[in-house]
């Protein structure tokens, strides 16, 4: 590792420990020339997940965009930000665990709806109305009937 102070290439690792719940390693190093210490982080490089949109264009998966869409559906509902963060974590893990590098926006929407249905039914209906693009009151009522019949 190149010393950030003098540029010398050789150093020694003084301390090494896991961070971020084991997803990275923090290493404390000492330069062999100037003896100054510095910290480096080692993390597994992951390939970005690409989302295939309805128009077939591709866009990098954006966790914040997903969270914001779910937040809108949960406005003025008794759902904590921690619950929403966990919901997004679960969806992100599900996508990564599928080992696919591409996922459709339709698949993501279905994952969100499945999780929201268990978390808050009003938020589920709000999200479904945007995601499924309800054209009129009848399609909205059909979704509500499905939800009631499942109970």
UniProtKB/Swiss-Prot annotation:
Signal peptide (UniProt feature, chain positions): none
Alphabetized InterPro entries for the sequence: ATP-cone_dom, NrdR-like_N, RNR_NrdR-like
Domain ATP-cone: 49-139
Keywords for this protein: ATP-binding, DNA-binding, Metal-binding, Nucleotide-binding, Repressor, Transcription, Transcription regulation, Zinc, Zinc-finger
Pfam families given in the database record: ATP-cone (PF03477), Zn_ribbon_NrdR (PF22811)
GO biological process annotation, one example: negative regulation of DNA-templated transcription
Cofactors required: Zn(2+)
Coiled-coil portions: none
Molecular-function GO term, any one: zinc ion binding
UniProt keyword Hydrolase present: no
UniProt zinc finger (unnamed) residues: 3-34
Cofactor note: Binds 1 zinc ion.
HAMAP family attached to this UniProt entry: NrdR (MF_00440)
Function: Negatively regulates transcription of bacterial ribonucleotide reductase nrd genes and operons by binding to NrdR-boxes.
Family: Belongs to the NrdR family.
Protein name according to UniProt: Transcriptional repressor NrdR
Organism of origin: Acetivibrio thermocellus (strain ATCC 27405 / DSM 1237 / JCM 9322 / NBRC 103400 / NCIMB 10682 / NRRL B-4536 / VPI 7372) (Clostridium thermocellum)
Top-level taxonomy: Bacteria, Bacillati, Bacillota, Clostridia, Eubacteriales
Gene from which the chain derives: nrdR
């Amino acid at each position: 590792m190149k010393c950030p102070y003098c540029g010398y290439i050789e150093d020694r690792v003084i301390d090494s420990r896991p961070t971020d719940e084991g997803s990275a390693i923090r290493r404390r190093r000492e330069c062999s020339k100037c003896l100054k210490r510095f910290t480096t982080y080692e993390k597994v490089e992951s390939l970005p997940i690409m989302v295939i949109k309805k128009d077939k264009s591709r866009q990098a998966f954006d966790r914040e965009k997903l969270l914001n869409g779910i937040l809108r559906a949960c406005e003025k509902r008794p759902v904590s930000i921690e619950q929403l963060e966990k919901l997004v974590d679960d969806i992100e893990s599900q996508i990564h665990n599928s080992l696919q590098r591409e996922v459709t926006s339709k698949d993501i929407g279905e994952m969100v709806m499945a999780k929201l249905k268990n978390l808050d039914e009003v938020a589920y209906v709000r999200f479904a109305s945007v995601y499924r693009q309800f054209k009129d009151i009848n399609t909205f009522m059909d979704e509500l009937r499905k939800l009631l019949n499942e109970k």
